[in-house]
Amino acid sequence: ERSTKHGDFKRTRNGDYIITINKFSNQFRFLLILIHELAHYFVALEFKNSKPHGNLWKNRFRNLLNPILNELVFPRDLLKHLINHMKNPKSSFSYDIELSKVIDKYDLNEKEFSYLDEIDDGQIFVYGDGNKFIKNKKRRKRYLCTNLLTKRQYLFLGNAKVKIYENSSN
């Protein structure tokens, strides 16, 4: 399973279109990503050279999602954030920190984690495949963190799922 993106839309060399979506235990995440990728498909059918997340895509995405933006489909807390998000949809729900966190609430079998923006500066955390980082400071919308092994610095979104490192000796 890809961890860097939830879905993808591609045109093959022979002109066919392919949509791939990761397997999710979260029905709302799956539905939203499917509609996101279908918006790419419909825009590609109609307009050959359009920006991937430009105005054409945003309008098509809104048109596809609006008919189901109601409490029959989405829980009230998620619906509230979705309606706000759809005013100017982003290329990924991950960039809408609050919406992303509400969607996460509906993940089944999710292991325990903390969001990076909920831990203190100076805290050591584990991310991804076990790399240890120290949270430094916020820079605009992202957090500057240092990999303890390589000393390289990385920027993380506040909704990055991390595990607090319990052992104080690195």
Where are these regions (language model features)?
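Metalloprotease/metallohydrolase-associated module, dominated by Zn2+-dependent proteases
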Residues: 1-24, 48-169
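Active-site recognition of the HExxH zinc-binding catalytic motif
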Residues: 32-45
